Amino acid sequence: MISMILLNITNSLLYILSILIAVAFLTLLERKLLGYMQHRKGPNLVGPMGLLQPIADGLKLITKEATKPTMSSPILFTLSPIMALILALTSWAPMPMPTPLTNMNLGLLFIMAMSGMFTYAILWSGWSSNSKYPLMGAMRAVAQIISYEVTLGLIIISMAILSGGYSLMLFTETQEHMWLLLSSWPLAMMWFTSTLAETNRSPFDLTEGESELVSGFNVEFSAGPFALLFLAEYTNILFMNTLSTMMFLNPGMTNPQLFTINLMTKTMILTTLFLWTRASYPRFRYDQLMHLLWKQYLPLTLAMYLLNTSTSMALCGTPPQ
């Protein structure tokens, strides 16, 4: 019994450590990629080819003094970055690699619940700073995330109808012979754009509009708390791209030994697309952002959901439960 508990704790810690290392080097990849796109080198001084830059950045942030605004709410100000990172890491629990930490029947719904909870961390961090710029950034972020969760939820339901359930292991079995991307590419395109908005990435980075809001909801955070918020943001980016790969480009279980490498290679390709988008597109206006969702994506996703449901029922094609 004790050995099983120790094994589970060790597995969880190794899982978390692997994610955090991946996130650290994702920041380096972003800086390098943006550097080359702007005809410069990017980080190249710390370690060979700048490979130790994320470690140096992390050490610098940890050793700095964390300042708190005098009029801030101290408890929420301290708790919100911790909560943000905990939620971002907890979302990975049902993800098969190829075996998940917890094989949930409703894994996708759990992920949506964690994503919804993340809005509280953002709202707390903006409100507890007791400053107008973080509060405006937090309000924008919450409005944006809640709005785009509508589309993400409808797409998840549509994909669950095609695969036969909300378990991510089912998606692996469904895509043994053919990716779901081929049969539902309009949903995949809308999903990719919605994940950009959900993770507050360019061109939907209205929460961090540098020219308007200084840095958004994390303006007043420095040192360790800022590092936690930063890690949470990039953990979410990596997670959303892993989820996209699981739902639309799943490697299947034909080669379980190569499953993780296959999955993470596709995830890195999608993440590179995120970074490429950041380098290429200007920021959307707020009204354009909302218009895109409520007047274009919502009717389309509803139509695709009804099509998938009616087709499955008409052809008796709903997979057995």
Swiss-Prot record:
Q: What is its EC number?
A: 7.1.1.2
Single GO MF annotation: NADH dehydrogenase (ubiquinone) activity
Topology in the membrane?
Multi-pass membrane protein
- The kind of enzyme this is, by top-level EC class, is translocase
**GO CC aspect terms:** mitochondrial inner membrane
Provide the function of this protein: Core subunit of the mitochondrial membrane respiratory chain NADH dehydrogenase (Complex I) that is believed to belong to the minimal assembly required for catalysis. Complex I functions in the transfer of electrons from NADH to the respiratory chain. The immediate electron acceptor for the enzyme is believed to be ubiquinone.
Protein family per UniProt: Belongs to the complex I subunit 1 family.
| Protein's UniProt name | NADH-ubiquinone oxidoreductase chain 1
Which species is this record about?
Lycodon semicarinatus
